[in-house]
């Protein structure tokens, strides 16, 4: 599901809200989540899961085109860990 598909589905379910209100709400939620992760904080949504940052150690990679070794710097990457309820729901469906 894309962001625009999510907005369309929410508009269909929440008929008392305008499409612009739904779009703004979705964009605000995603922006708040991104800025929370950017500041190094964790996001926990009970029953759904948690978002956090994991550190990837510096390593030696390869250029896929030439095969040359390339030094890759360490970096933080977003990580999602599904909650128990979400895992169970996915496994039943």
Swiss-Prot record:
Name the domain of life this protein comes from.
Bacteria
UniProt cross-references to PANTHER family, sorted A to Z: DNA-BINDING PROTEIN HU, INTEGRATION HOST FACTOR SUBUNIT BETA
Q: Which SUPFAM superfamilies match?
A: IHF-like DNA-binding proteins (SSF47729)
Q: Which UniProt keywords apply?
A: DNA recombination, DNA-binding, Transcription, Transcription regulation, Translation regulation
User: Pfam families per the record?
Assistant: Bac_DNA_binding (PF00216)
Q: What is this protein called?
A: Integration host factor subunit beta
NCBIfam families attached here? hip, PRK00199.1
Q: Which GO terms describe its molecular function?
A: DNA binding; structural constituent of chromatin
Q: Name one GO biological process term.
A: regulation of translation
Subunit info here reads: Heterodimer of an alpha and a beta chain.
Q: What does this protein do?
A: This protein is one of the two subunits of integration host factor, a specific DNA-binding protein that functions in genetic recombination as well as in transcriptional and translational control.
Q: Which cellular components does GO assign to this protein?
A: chromosome; cytosol
The entry sums up its family as follows: Belongs to the bacterial histone-like protein family.
Task: Name the gene.
Answer: ihfB
InterPro entries listed in its UniProt record: Hist_DNA-bd, Histone-like_DNA-bd_CS, IHF-like_DNA-bd_dom_sf, IHF_beta
């Amino acid at each position: 599901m894309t962001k625009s598909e999510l907005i369309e589905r929410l508009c269909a379910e929440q008929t008392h809200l305008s499409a612009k209100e739904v779009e703004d709400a979705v964009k605000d939620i995603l922006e708040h989540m991104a800025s929370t992760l950017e500041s190094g904080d964790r996001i926990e949504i009970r029953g759904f899961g948690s978002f956090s940052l994991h550190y990837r150690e510096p390593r030696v990679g390869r250029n896929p085109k030439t095969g040359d070794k390339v030094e890759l710097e360490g970096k933080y990457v977003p990580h999602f860990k599904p909650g128990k309820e979400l895992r169970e729901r996915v496994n039943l469906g």
